Amino acid sequence: MAVSGILGKKVGMTQLFDEKGDVRPCTVLQAGPCVVTQRKTAAKDGYDAAQIGLVEFVKESRLNKPERGHLGKNNLPPVRLMKEVGIVVDAAASEGNGDATKIGDRVLVDIFDGEKFVDIVGTSKGRGFAGVVKRHHFRGGPGSHGSMFTIAGSIGSSAYPSRVFPGMRMAGHMGNARITVRNLRILGIDKNENLLVVEGAVPGPNGRYVVISKAKKPPRERRGFSADTGPINPLKASKRLIKKKS
């Protein structure tokens, strides 16, 4: 399967212990199963992509008429969520010998076999109307008597500029925004349950839907650091290299 991403749901956070005994905070994601509902091609649409739907129990009456028609013409089951993800065009497809991605194909968590990092797009938790101290980490006013503790301060002088500049950090709605977290390390894959375990936090509360895709810019291995084993002692590494050469 040439699809580069999958739809999923945040299950929750837990922790794992690596070989050294260190604790690694991780997030468990329900990745799929999904089905390809539409195929975009460069010849017809100007770009290559696949529209996939998350196969989850949903009443057909919950879908609107365009969605029922879109899925019904290809005899596809009702899906909870539909998103567009990129695909990798195979060599056979580029030569005109056929396309590996077709409508009705299943997309499972096994698309991340051999991958070390993923990018995750989700919606952060909504915090409601928040002040500048909570929203922008302002210091606030002095703690003496008669002062406003969480005051924002001046937002613009009266003489000049006589206006508030665009983008001024002020109190307002906080959270409930689209957040992209890049290069989360994959710690485990459960193909039977379609579970994906990644290191670190994922935006949003438990049960919120996310888009999981292969890392666009995976980190390079720095000198003296291995992505699998962690920091490397350069002295011991050089001694091992000398032994191999001898």
Model-derived regions, located:
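Extended basic (Lys/Arg/His-rich) segments that typically form rRNA-contacting surfaces
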Residues: 1-246
